[in-house]
C-alpha cells in the first residue's frame, strides 16, 4: 500500500491569511484541492496539520483523508514529515506532498506511486529538466523519514541518496508550482503549457 503524506502544518505567513482555506475559482479551498488530488493517486492519504487547525482537519476528513496532528509543527517541515510517516509505519511506501501545491494532476501522482510499486527506492516527477513534487520513498526509508526533524525535510534525504532517485518525465507544470503568496495565484495564468488556469483565483489581477 502506498500512502500519501500531505504536509499541511505550515503557518503560511507570507500569504496574508489562512492559505490552505483560501478558495480557488471552483470554490474548493486550496489545501483541500491538494489533498483530493493526492488521494486520487494513492491508496490512502494522511494530512498532517497543526493542533489548532480543526477546521482544516474537518475538511480533510470530509475529503477522505486521515488526520495526523503534529504537536511539533512549528519546528519545521521535517517534524511534520516524520509525524505523517509515523502515522503509517506499515505502508509499502510514502508519497510526500505539499498542501500548497493544488495544481499537480492526479495522474502524475498516480504514476509516481506506480514507480514505487514497481520497485523504485525513491521516485519524483520531472518537468522540463526540473524535479518537482510529490516525492516517493519506499519502505526501506522508514527510519530515515521518521528521524527527520526541524527544517530537515525530504530534500536532505534526496541529497544523500541521489543515485537511488528514479524520475518520472511528465508534461505537468503543476509539479513545480507552490503557492506562497497571492501573487503566485495570478502568476500561474502565465505559465506556458498550464492547463489549470481556470482553477486559479477568480479575483486575481
What is the meaning of each model-derived region?
Residues 12, 22, 142-143, 186:
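Nucleotide phosphate-binding site architecture
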Residues 1-99, 103-131, 163-170:
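Nucleotide and nucleotide-moiety/phosphate-recognizing core
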Residues 133-137, 177-179:
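Short glycine- and hydrophobic/aromatic-rich loop-to-beta-strand nucleating segment
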Residues 20, 29-30, 108, 140, ...:
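Residue-level recognition of oxygen-bearing side chains
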Residues 143-205:
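Conserved alpha/beta core of the MobA/IspD/sugar-nucleotide pyrophosphorylase nucleotidyltransferase superfamily
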Residues 33, 37, 83, 111, ...:
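Alpha-helical scaffold segments in soluble metabolic enzymes
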Amino acid at each position: 500500500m502506498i500512502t500519501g503524506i500531505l504536509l499541511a502544518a505550515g503557518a503560511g505567513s507570507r500569504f496574508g491569511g489562512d492559505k490552505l482555506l483560501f478558495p480557488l475559482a471552483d470554490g474548493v479551498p486550496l489545501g483541500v484541492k491538494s489533498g483530493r488530488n493526492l488521494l486520487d493517486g494513492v491508496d490512502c492519504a494522511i494530512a498532517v496539520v497543526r493542533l489548532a487547525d480543526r477546521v482544516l482537519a474537518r475538511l480533510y476528513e470530509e475529503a477522505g483523508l486521515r488526520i495526523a496532528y503534529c504537536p511539533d509543527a512549528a519546528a519545521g517541515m521535517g517534524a511534520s514529515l516524520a509525524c505523517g510517516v509515523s502515522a503509517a509505519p506499515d505502508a509499502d511506501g510514502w508519497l510526500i506532498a505539499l498542501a500548497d501545491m493544488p495544481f499537480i494532476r492526479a495522474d502524475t501522482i498516480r504514476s509516481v506511486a506506480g514507480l514505487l510499486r514497481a520497485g523504485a527506492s525513491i521516485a519524483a516527477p520531472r518537468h522540463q529538466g526540473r524535479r518537482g513534487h510529490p516525492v516517493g520513498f519506499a519502505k526501506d526509508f522508514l527510519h530515515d523519514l521518521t528521524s527527520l526533524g526541524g527544517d530537515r525535510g525530504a530534500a536532505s534525504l534526496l541529497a544523500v541518496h541521489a543515485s537511488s532517485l528514479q524520475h518520472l518525465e511528465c508534461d505537468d507544470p503543476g509539479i513545480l508550482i507552490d503557492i506562497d503568496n497571492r501573487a503566485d495565484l495570478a502568476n500561474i495564468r502565465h505559465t506556458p503549457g498550464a492547463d489549470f488556469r481556470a482553477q486559479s483565483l477568480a479575483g486575481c489581477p
